[in-house]
Amino acid sequence: GRADNFLRL
């Protein structure tokens, strides 16, 4: 999801 993508930054 988008939240997960943010954490992967």
UniProtKB/Swiss-Prot annotation:
<keyword id="KW-0527">Neuropeptide</keyword>
<dbReference type="GO" id="GO:0007218">
    <property type="term" value="P:neuropeptide signaling pathway"/>
</dbReference>
<dbReference type="GO" id="GO:0005576">
    <property type="term" value="C:extracellular region"/>
</dbReference>
<protein>
    <recommendedName>
        <fullName>Extended FMRFamide-6</fullName>
    </recommendedName>
</protein>
<keyword id="KW-0027">Amidation</keyword>
<feature type="modified residue" description="Leucine amide">
    <location>
        <position position="9"/>
    </location>
</feature>
<comment type="similarity">
    <text>Belongs to the FARP (FMRF amide related peptide) family.</text>
</comment>
<keyword id="KW-0964">Secreted</keyword>
<comment type="function">
    <text>FMRFamides and FMRFamide-like peptides are neuropeptides.</text>
</comment>
